[in-house]
Amino acid sequence: MNGQNIRIRLKAFDHRILDASTREIVSTAKRTGANVRGPIPLPTRIEKFTVNRSPHIDKKSREQFEMRTHKRLLDIVDPTPQTVDALMKLDLSAGVDVEIKL
């Protein structure tokens, strides 16, 4: 696969699971002889939701919830066919969203 790059974008709510998955992908790619750029941490997306604490009265009493989406970017430069096979067979943790672009 001469001159090609594989771009892997990972998303998760828990940064520990995300970092473990990126370490697993990087070690697999390096073991099969590919060069890896990254992991590059992308900005964390924070969604905040504000709701009333009481269902009936008291508009001034509110509660906030937030959802954080952590993201990482990996570039695999000049992957070998063994790299692609190893990445396809890789079993990552549940809760990690993986997007792959060739």
Swiss-Prot record:
Residue spans crossing the bilayer: none
SUPFAM superfamilies reported in the protein's UniProt record: Ribosomal protein S10
Pfam families, sorted: Ribosomal_S10
Listed GO CC annotations: ribonucleoprotein complex; ribosome
Keyword Nucleotidyltransferase set for record: no
SMART domains: Ribosomal_S10
Cited InterPro entries: Ribosomal_uS10 (IPR001848), Ribosomal_uS10_CS (IPR018268), Ribosomal_uS10_dom (IPR027486), Ribosomal_uS10_dom_sf (IPR036838)
Keywords annotated in UniProt: Ribonucleoprotein, Ribosomal protein
Coiled-coil spans in chain: none
GO MF: structural constituent of ribosome; tRNA binding
Origin superkingdom: Bacteria
GO biological process, one term: translation
Key word ATP-binding present: no
Family listed: Belongs to the universal ribosomal protein uS10 family.
Functional description taken from the UniProt entry: Involved in the binding of tRNA to the ribosomes.
Binding partners and assembly: Part of the 30S ribosomal subunit.
Name this protein carries in UniProt: Small ribosomal subunit protein uS10
Classification of source organism: Bacteria, Pseudomonadati, Pseudomonadota, Alphaproteobacteria, Hyphomicrobiales
